[in-house]
């Protein structure tokens, strides 16, 4: 500690008699427009001790430099903020082509597996085994009409093409509504991951198992419960309107193409529920692969 100055060297204001109104505090170095003089004054008042003027100049000069350097260091750290996570380097054309081919191939394989899963959906009342896959078989009927030799094109190729179409609809819509340019929050990035797609697929398998094994009073009760659950699952897994409205349209088309759905409301709800959630699953896979 420095030696204290004698009382006869201080006036009533705590300033030495010989340098009253002549000694000025050294001005803090400017830090740009982000920090104004008011901020420096406030920080200076809070950090420097109240009895600052009682010490010798050699002590106060060194302490002032320490405080000023600390302020400069904090300001430099504020200016060195890393760029936003949304700023990505543009991929080369070759990388984009490889990514697109891989995405189409994976969606094609998923389209082949999807009818196999749908054949496992049935209950013990009105929904028989294989009824729900009738909507996907319309693609085979279209193939038989437009292809000169239908036997040359296998049925699994039709199902794979349908998988590519279902998985590409939402990424195609996103390119128009500029979904990829919206702020990438942690929740949105979390929802478009491979792990999220796997959880969605496991949920579909759990729903199919629940419809088959649980004791329902009627098919309408099971289909209605699935309809209410679909809203919660959509909010949990995705929550975007670009999936909700196209999913409803595809579900309604699947129910409209089934002749039995006109007389049985439970079958219509089954078709809407299954293909809405299936479209949600393909949309998540497509977003993950293309983005």
Swiss-Prot record:
GO cellular component: cytosol; endoplasmic reticulum; endoplasmic reticulum membrane; nuclear periphery; nucleus
Transmembrane segments: 97-117, 157-177, 231-251, 262-282
Perinuclear space side: 118-156, 252-261
InterPro entries reported in the protein's UniProt record: INSIG_fam (IPR025929)
The keyword Secreted belongs to this UniProt entry's keyword annotation: no
Sequence positions bearing Phosphoserine: 39, 76
Transcription recorded as keyword: no
GO BP terms: sterol biosynthetic process
Keyword terms of this UniProt record: Endoplasmic reticulum, Membrane, Phosphoprotein, Transmembrane, Transmembrane helix
Cytoplasmic membrane side: 1-96, 178-230, 283-291
Compartment(s) where it occurs, according to its Swiss-Prot or TrEMBL record: Endoplasmic reticulum membrane
Alphabetized GO MF terms: unfolded protein binding
Region (Disordered): 1-23
Membrane topology: Multi-pass membrane protein
Further comment found in the protein's record: Present with 1900 molecules/cell in log phase SD medium.
Sequence similarity: Belongs to the INSIG family.
Function: Stabilizes the HMG-CoA reductase HMG2 by preventing its HRD1-dependent degradation. Binds directly to the sterol-sensing domain (SSD)-containing transmembrane region of HMG2, promoting its folding to protect it from degradation.
Protein name, entry field: Protein NSG1
Organism: Saccharomyces cerevisiae (strain ATCC 204508 / S288c) (Baker's yeast)
Organism phylogeny: Eukaryota, Fungi, Dikarya, Ascomycota, Saccharomycotina
